[in-house]
Curated annotation (Swiss-Prot):
Membrane-traversing stretches: 63-83, 103-123, 139-159, 162-182, 195-215, 222-242, 298-318, 341-361, 380-400, 408-428, 442-462, 474-494
Protein name: MFS transporter fsdG
PANTHER family with a match to the protein in the record: MAJOR FACILITATOR SUPERFAMILY, MAJOR FACILITATOR SUPERFAMILY (MFS) PROFILE DOMAIN-CONTAINING PROTEIN-RELATED
Entry-listed glycosylation sites: N8, N26, N189, N367
Compartments, as annotated in UniProt: Cell membrane
Organismal lineage: Eukaryota, Fungi, Dikarya, Ascomycota, Pezizomycotina
């Protein structure tokens, strides 16, 4: 397979996998042999190339509506990750707790839901379709956010906060697949997927800016009430405008009717071009594969384990800062809860800058192929090698400038380098893992990487405030910077020896 062909085939997968798109999402070119027998099975396909039930034939307005709604749902789920953070101190006073670990947990436990829930929602969307996952998760997301708003003790709050994270992660899990189901032109599809990807990028930055002023003026509970209003509006719009777009689900229901009428089992087209049709798999088998295969990759593929650990550690550091910014800027600079939310702007601009640079360099360097014409996954790693040193520089800058109480803009400028350096690591690593595993392993490797990433984001922040209390802002952030320095050679090592690890430990699950 030539490099460009491989890249085009796999690029759909990587972008869809931003939301952990399941292995069996349909992105295939069908051969329109509807109801043609195949051995003991009936092949269920579209009724010709113009079948109106096929999302690829829906009008462009449907594509726009689904893209906007799914992107808004994804943004809402990510807004909730940190929107409440500036109000955590108010919750601590109301519930009479002074334990900094518990206070940090009220923010970060939400992300544990992002780590665990996709292992269930992804296979469920494969079996029952994407639409039911959206509607069900929206209802639970609304209910659990309201439960957070009316919690009467901290234990109840933490429990409902975790469940809200489980429900809020669903649009990220299946949203990219919804956009890809339409198979619009590459330009429109890329634009839509970039819009969808802004949710995980901007949500955690915009959330505390809004939440800070809400908490300051009307209290921390209103951050959840306002979030619930947003979710309710989006849920109503979803019920009105969203339709099932998964080809596997639509054809599966058509096949179920045929099986009921004829008694014969059915098959649907393969999930990727050139793949043979396959029979409907049992739900138990699909769920088992979604749970087991990512774990096998982490255990048996050192390249997956090492890079997943690296990005998870970096991602956890970002959320350590997110959970401690209010205490740092309120304590060191006397910011109000509302103004302290603005301290997230620096890291947000850094992330956006890294995103644009990655897209630019990606276009310049991702066409590199080996002597066999195959894409070289290591071609995505130079950005990480060049800019990963910015991460420890950012921590040293932020820590000592805040410790010495220089002008508040100086530590915020330091967080810009943290945001830039962290995303200069996370994005190339994600691309490398997906292209190194190929289309058939992309879903599982991203499920494994994302699970580890959100576990670190949930638990690493718990040590943040205690670390600052013991070491101070200067040496506390220097400790984080030194750990980043220790890990800094990882990109260069994989750029040099990544091909050897891929050959020595191939994906064979």
């Amino acid at each position: 397979m030539k490099g460009n062909e491989f890249r085009n085939q796999t690029q759909t997968t990587i972008k869809n996998e931003l939301a952990e798109w399941s292995d069996n999402s349909n992105n295939s070119q069908v051969d329109y042999a509807s109801n043609a027998p195949s051995g003991d099975h009936v092949l269920v396909d579209w009724d010709g190339p113009n079948d109106p039930k096929n999302p690829k034939n829906w009008p462009h307005s449907a594509f726009l509506i689904h893209t906007i709604l799914v992107s808004m749902l994804c943004l809402a789920g990510n807004l909730a990750t940190t929107m409440y953070a500036p109000g955590a101190a108010q919750l601590a006073v109301e519930f009479k707790t002074r334990d900094t670990t518990t206070i940090a947990l009220t923010v970060s436990i939400y992300l544990l839901g992002f780590a665990l829930a996709p292992m269930v929602t992804s296979p469920l969307s494969e079996v029952y379709g994407r639409l039911i996952v959206y509607h069900t998760s929206n209802i639970f997301f609304l209910g659990f956010n309201l439960a957070c708003a009316f919690s009467s003790n901290i234990g109840m709050f933490i429990a409902f906060r975790f469940l809200a994270g489980c429900a809020g992660s669903a649009p990220m899990t299946v949203g990219g697949g919804t956009i890809a189901d339409f198979a619009a032109s590459p330009e429109k599809n890329n634009t839509a997927l970039r819009l969808f990807a802004l949710g995980p990028l901007l949500g955690p930055v915009i959330g505390p800016i809004v939440g800070g002023f809400v908490a300051e003026n009307i209290g921390w509970r209103w951050t959840f009430r306002i979030m619930s209003i947003v979710i309710a509006v989006l849920s109503i719009l979803s019920c009105i405008f969203l339709r099932e777009t998964s080809a596997a689900a639509i054809l599966g229901r058509r096949g179920a009717r045929i099986t009921k009428e004829t008694g014969k089992p059915f098959m649907i087209p393969g999930p990727m071009p050139g793949m043979p049709p396959k029979p409907q798999q049992p739900t138990k088998e699909i769920v088992s594969r979604s749970l087991v295969r990512p774990m096998k990759m982490l255990i048996f593929l050192p390249q997956v384990l090492i890079l997943s650990f690296y990005t998870a550690f970096v991602f956890g550091l970002i959320y350590l800062l997110f959970t401690t910014f209010p205490a740092v800027f309120e304590g060191q600079y006397g910011f109000s809860p509302g103004v302290s939310g603005l301290s997230y702007i620096g890291i947000g601009f850094g992330m956006v800058g890294a995103l644009f640079l990655f897209n630019f360099i990606n276009m310049k360097m991702s066409n590199r192929t080996d002597k066999h014409g195959q894409l070289i996954p290591e071609s995505y790693l130079p950005l990480m090698t060049w800019f990963s040193p910015l991460l420890p520089i950012g921590f040293f800058w932020y820590g000592w400038s805040a410790d010495k109480q220089t002008h508040w803009v100086v530590p915020i400028l330091g967080t810009f380098f943290v945001g830039f350096g962290s995303f200069a690591i996370i994005m190339p690593t994600t691309a490398y893992l997906v292209y190194a595993q190929g289309p058939q392993g992309a879903a599982s490797v991203l499920a494994a990487s994302n699970m580890m990433r959100y576990v670190f984001a949930a638990f690493l922040p718990l040590a943040g405030q205690n670390m600052y209390d013991q070491l101070g802002l200067g040496w506390g952030n220097s400790l984080l910077g030194f750990l980043c320095v220790v890990l800094a050679p990882v990109p260069a090592i994989f750029q040099r020896y990544g091909h050897y690890l891929r050959e020595r430990f191939p994906t064979e699950f």
